[in-house]
Amino acid sequence: MLKVLQEPSLRLPLLLTCSMQAGQQTSGINAVFYYSQTIFKQAGLTELQSQYATICSGFINVCTAVFMLYLLPRTGRRPLLLGSIFVASVLLAALAAAMKFINAATWMPYVCMIAVLAYVLVYGFGLGPIPYFIASEMFEVAPRPAGMAWGSLANWGGNFLVGMCFPTMRDVIGPYSFLVFATVTMGLFVFQKLYFPETRGKTPAQVTEVCSHGLHSRPLRSAA
């Protein structure tokens, strides 16, 4: 696993893979699923409404995963990923605002619920599925296991970080917890927009060549 860190041409693919995997978790998806019912209750929904909203979140996630089996082979990874990350960031900020001003209007709890459900939907269109397989499209056969292992480590690291920090964040800063997730997710969007090349229709060798100069690489310019 350490050899892949010493190869300059693999550093950018590794950074992209690990940031995607970690960002998948630090976008707050597990905070939403782990604490969805609590979130809905804090938003002012009743016990029954909270249960229905939580079930609906899981149902949307499953339906999106099934639809992506059809969409992924036909659509570029870059637009799906960037669109998903950007909209997810906006929805997280909207969720923070809706929960902050939950008592401002009687319909505000429903804005909160819609923001959560929409977030789960857009997450499933890119940020959810793409990080899991992107290493197979960015690394050639020899370094691929190491690249995927580092990505998995980043994923679980992000998962652990959110699981440990979110309860405290929720208690200390309340709704602003989701503003933290929104900021981190927007940072991921900027990094991926600058450096993530389209991998659909390209071999891993071609992707590695495009990213061979590390952070000095310009994947979009090279593709043009």
Where do the language-model regions lie?
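Alpha-helical transmembrane bundle of multi-pass membrane proteins
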Residues: 1-224
